[in-house]
């Protein structure tokens, strides 16, 4: 109603209008106040909107009518004004009620919203009643003004009554306060009395404790005195016992000397008889242990500083036994783990009980090993990994065909092996012994570095002292146990013992040892000479009788397994054969009963005896050999191994009627070895052998470590720390023997437990012998290449020599040398050629014996062979650290040979050393690249099994057999030589120095080699297809090749020559070859410059003092990279022969237009980010920029690999338009990522170097009230409200609203409310209403308590301030920059000045700890920040083709890993103030924005993957694949990626594909519908919220962000100029849920390549391009006829050939068949 109409109204009409408006208001108010939340929320929302609008409109009308009142109200003016104010208040109350109702609809279950709504509704009802009453009073007083006097009198009486009531209340409160004060004083007095009593009690207790301690000290002193007396007595007894033992040893030595004299006499007689009876000699195998003085010293018999041995014999024996126990336990564990793995991977359920036995043995050995460990955590970790291996092995046997369990088994075994390697390292560092592992084929050098061995050169043996000392310790121990036998022995018994071979019954074991032992022959002491007195004094008595005729060395296993051999006469072959068979049966029977474990040398000796018996029975004899010896094996290491064979002395045979001299028996099983009868050599041969004695006894070398690691992990995974390479030589032997000889020769290398079966290593007729390594005896001798043993043993058998003092002994020794070599050759020829299960399918030739790198664990995922991208083990042989390792090896060799160089090298600076290493590394890299390129160029030729090329990851310098460097390294790298100088060890351990440079060169070489696989195509199909076409078609194509110009001059000058006549045109085959080469060259240039650009950007971001030259260099390289990208795209179009009028060319045109704009935009600073980089947020922005730069560098590298794969797929299928579309999409993503990288680098450089924005900008204040001192602010109400916990009846009191000073005061005061929860909420949300600087200022103000306050209040307040600071530092240390930390330190000094030393110490220690953690993380991020190793998949398939072949479940796992990695990085401050929606605050939420951007990219990528497919069947296949991926994502509770897929499937270009939807299977549709119902957005994702979300969980982030948005918009930041802290409480609940998901969720899926690399970056077409593709795939029904004639399925230029009499389908099919045939050829 207008003003004129209102002015014409009378009083009655006016009041009637007011009454009508009031009725409408009451109706609408009832509607709003009585909202039923149980109904549908959508209808409630509509009803609320309508009623709220009507309510506000009617209230405004009422206010308008009151303001424009037409009647005269001069007598009651104040009533009119009062009526007007009441209506205004009512309007505000109604607005609050409407907001509360809206919040109630959104969250009806929240206690805060319901209570707030009820409160607002009550106030609205009260206000409407007051309004109606005011209106009625106004009407009454208008008609009767005299009533207002009565009202005034009533008002005066009411005011007086109120004043009296207030006075009474104040008096009552005052009395109550006094009572409370009295009670408090009484309580304080009681507390003081109690404290005094407690102090007295404590003093009494302390006195009692002191008396008890004094008594204990006295008792301990008495016990120590008694122990010292007992030890002195024990020492005296031991000294007496040692004297007695020495006397006994002297007696025994005298007896032995007498026996030697008798033996010498007998030998002289035997030599005379031997000349008469040479036809039938009987050779007695020698039994003495020959050593020389030089070998004793070089072999380590003399004690060293780092040796486990010591002059005290008892301690030495104990340490040797402990080392032996550890060695046996380690060997048993490795072999039994091999058996478990073999049985599990084979899937044989019948062998399941064997897993139990092997597991039992492993558990026993783990217990033994754990006793020797200093770090007990290693033992517990080993036990845990072992239990997991057994559990997974059982699952693998049950599920034979499931690849997943086999992969899990390999992962568990890898963890177990890694722990074993750490245990070996720890024990090695404690015991200082390196021989404890060599006897089992494991070398200490193989655990920490790569072996450098030249197979053509021999390495001089050098052993540590532990082995030789163990030999002598066991000799003395066995000698002391058999003293009685020696005292009773005589010459007759000595003679008879030679002819009676038997197994000794003295086979006993010590309780702490395992049954892998073979005690030494006691008679070895006969062969030592008196010259050994220079060794240790405690061992001199046992070495007085040892003779040293020649320099020979012997090595043994853990307890030096050697056997005493004896022979029988030729007249009794039957008896000897019976004894041999009986002994063999006894040994096998005991081995089956688990009583003993037969050493390998015993088995070999029994096998040799059986072979020789069969040869005697068949009448075969050796033509030249007159003596035999026990087969000698060697102890081996992974890098260097020495093979030592001792001299053999022969004794002429006795007459048949005489007895042979006897040898004393030992405590281990021994066997008799019959030898064939051979004639002796001539004197000339003896002289020649004498002259060549030194050459024939050069130390031999074999390498078993490589083969040992093979049979430990013979299927897939190498043991970490061991090399997996093997070596072999050509097989020159074809003779075979019977099964008995075969079973004996191929025995186990270490039969340490009954649960381990011996792996048999044999040779196959189609393969070479898999040998240990060459046994090089001499450089010019031809026998050194034939003397290579096909064995896998790591034990050592000793050829024992008997010494004679006559001149004939030397001749016999020389004869034995040649005979040993010939016998080894014969034994090699007798090994049967059976296939080997443990060896590789292709053996390498000796000329190509290379150090192949360890391969990653590979397995099949779907139909593509992939690999786990495991963390690289920190060893020098890592691919990334190749240059660094090689350079330091070179420097180490120089420093070891030239001490002066090492001294000067130590004095140099670290920068100088790094430059030297970098220069050497570049030289090695250049040579490596040259060799790798030459090898890759020749890789197309077929290689035979004997000719295997060098892997590209190996060093050509270290692998070259003819290289002098390789020879030098291998000759120096023996068992006693450490290739790393002590001065360089620190550098050697810091292996990540130049990993960034090598990572760049590595990926460049990978991409270059991959592009080199593009094969040149043969004759073009167009020569056949274009015979019937006109010349305009060729001219059109040549136009397109020349850049689209249609003039004839450019066509005639083109390199694509025209060949034709009579109007028929074509082009030469050379054109297609040139196109292929141009595509490869442009792609190679692009990738090289792209990777170089990434490296430059990353280096520039690390350097703080950035120069302008580097920036200009980056921009120039950026421009050149985009130019090469454009050239590569044009080359791919030319190679694919794309029609210029095709829609594909429009995509290329868009990218060409996009490149110049990006060139101008790249490398620009963001003004918003620069202005935000003030004192408050500078350190946060720089930290986020570092993370963003690293992420973008990785993205560019991944996109480069994807583009490489796409280019290769285009070369394989040029007709495939989908590959071209993928290339264009990847190129656009590459450009955008590269521009973002340049912008980030430029922003960091500018913010880091510009001093104007660092410290000069003042911190802005948020409110003027904050400047008031916290102690000077007037008292304001700070009420605490009750908030209930969700889903329970519990709750707590929290402050509703207050000023900043009052909120901080509530944090630091003593009250009954929940301070811990309040503190958590405050720390999570305080940056939404203040900043860290202001909070620090207020806390310092709170600490400065005024002097007027009581001392108790002062102390408690200061304590709570420091306690809150401690909590703040522990939880939110990222809030502190360097300047704020400086204020903290100043506050700490203030604490010291105030005598709060305890608080200062606590605060200072926490600050130091957090600063150390921050500096350590910065060092890791700068020095050790590396990019993950990327994998280029095999084959010539595009990423889309690979995606179709990959397994859906594995794709879901990798997507979950990628998305959860981003989600776990979200910080609480990123979820405040809606910073992700505001441009000025986006720098605060980098991870939230990254997750939003990835979800958007992922949705477009899903749509692109479907629309890139030309055939509708392929589109249906991709669609169903995404549905299956969504199903697996739902099972993993990955709702974020799940909804991203549904967003991509519900875009407009996809929803219009009706034909595609019609072909979906019913199963796929049911899954799609169920998941769509779950993720429906109706009711604010009601279905999604109702689902139980148990960890692991990846929630849908947009739901969380929408909840935060409603909380921010629906609740004001301040209420009556007070901070609304209840709003922060609501926000804290959401943030706490996010933190709970981050902490409780752990997706322990392995990173699998190439899936992970392909899914890291998701290039897609633009929305307009997608819609254009959608129209092409399924045109509109109205334009269907036109679309079929103009748009072809292949978009190839042959599709427009209908005018040239070429059919569309025929031409396209012919082209496709041609390319397929050319690829197959």
Swiss-Prot record:
InterPro entries: Ras-like_GEF (IPR008937), Ras-like_Gua-exchang_fac_N (IPR000651), Ras_GEF_dom_sf (IPR023578), RASGEF_cat_dom (IPR001895), RASGEF_cat_dom_sf (IPR036964). Residues 1291-1411 form the N-terminal Ras-GEF domain. One of its GO terms (cellular component) is plasma membrane. Residues 213-232, 445-515, 551-701, 716-766, 797-837, 929-981 are annotated as: Disordered. It comes from the Eukaryota. Disruption phenotype: Absence of the phosphoprotein gefR. PROSITE patterns: RASGEF_CAT, RASGEF_NTER. Residues 148-279, 802-831 form a coiled coil. GO terms for biological process: Ras protein signal transduction; response to differentiation-inducing factor 1. Residues 216-232, 687-701 have a biased composition (Basic and acidic residues). Residues 618-627, 968-978 have a biased composition (Polar residues). Phosphorylated on threonine residues. The keyword Coiled coil applies. PANTHER family: GUANINE NUCLEOTIDE EXCHANGE FACTOR, RAS GUANINE NUCLEOTIDE EXCHANGE FACTOR R. Promotes the exchange of Ras-bound GDP by GTP. May also play a role in the activation of rasG. This is Ras guanine nucleotide exchange factor R. The lineage of its organism: Eukaryota, Amoebozoa, Evosea, Eumycetozoa, Dictyostelia.
